[in-house]
């Protein structure tokens, strides 16, 4: 594929990601909602520094996109990304998300 086509594909994927952040986080939360309770248990025990318990919204707002990889195979380009949390509600892990060429989102597991 020519360089302009590659750039267009990258721009398209990043634009989609910016427009669909909530969709990606929704899929992540389906498999990882328990982190909110785990962090709140740690806050209560004093093993996680926070001023007060967190809500699901606090957790969702802490998630940031990191390490985007785009695989270009003609029309069938796919991409993966890692979700990190600031503060570190994922306890040193990153949530790997996979997005196929039809923009179907799957949780690929935790890294780290």
Task: Mark where each language-model region is.
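Mature extracytoplasmic or otherwise solvent-exposed domains
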Residues: 1-22, 26, 75-80, 84-86, ...
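Long, charge-rich alpha-helical interaction segments
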Residues: 3-59
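Acidic, proline/glycine-rich low-complexity IDRs
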Residues: 57-63, 67-112
């Amino acid at each position: 594929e020519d360089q302009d086509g590659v750039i267009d594909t990258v721009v398209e994927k990043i634009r989609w990601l910016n427009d669909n952040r909530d969709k990606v986080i929704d899929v992540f939360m389906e498999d990882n909602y328990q982190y909110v309770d785990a962090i709140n248990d740690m806050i209560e025990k004093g093993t996680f520094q926070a001023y007060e318990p967190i809500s699901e919204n606090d957790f969702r707002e802490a998630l940031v996109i990191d390490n985007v990889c785009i695989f270009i195979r003609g029309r069938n380009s796919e991409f993966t990304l890692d979700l990190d949390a600031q503060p570190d509600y994922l306890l040193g892990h990153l949530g790997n998300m996979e997005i196929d060429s039809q923009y179907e989102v799957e949780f690929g597991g935790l890294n780290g």
